[in-house]
């Protein structure tokens, strides 16, 4: 893991299995590794190998019409020194794939504090 990238990562995570209260909250920092999320070091390693884990689904993406549930997750903070404000939902195949790519952070609808 690059130290500069790790030092510039500080995330606040909120997850709701219903899209409404109650929300489950967790944090993650990388460089040094810290926060309340389980498996912090592994999460930092996974993030360091990802190109753009918080990028939205492209507007021109062709997505399957599949519903994955009412879950909502929000990730706010910095990643590699860049501001992050990302919302994850499971409303179609593209959004489900995007959610699954960072499920080590946001879980599968349950609390990320495992």
Predicted regions, residues:
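N- and C-terminal low-complexity/disordered segments
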Residues: 1-114
